[in-house]
Amino acid sequence: MKAAESTKHKFNSNWGAFMEEGFTPKIVGFLCNWCSYNAADLAGAAKVEVPSSLSVIRVMCSGRVDPVLVATALLRGADGVLIAGCHPGDCHYREGNYYARRRFTLLKETLETLGLDSNRLMLAWISASEGRRFGEVTNEFAQQIREMGPNPMKQKTSL
């Protein structure tokens, strides 16, 4: 094997390990306007550590998160998606979080059918006063995704 080919071979065979070593998961968070978004705001005001790679999308209700948006986020490069809403029984729109829970269950099944680990999707109930809990949930989810590695779907698609 020539020196140039050897270097190229080493580069290619070690690239995956190198990338995962410094892997910072990209997480998209769909946060309920009435509870979870306010918890994120409170976490920031209290200087609670949250993943720097968390991209927040404010939605009026967790029950209004379109499954197509979740799938699109994963296909376009998100390593994980968090849907966070009010605790059951506390929804500003009465039953929105129950809709979210049903959609979440179906979405997880769909992801598994497509060959993607459904643990890349998380549903959490976080009230407006739970800034610390917001930090805990997002950091635990980021660690879970970090252990899973990069989203394999983003490598297979070219959107």
Language model features: what each stretch is:
Residues 2-159:
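Iron-sulfur-associated redox domains of electron-transfer enzymes in respiratory
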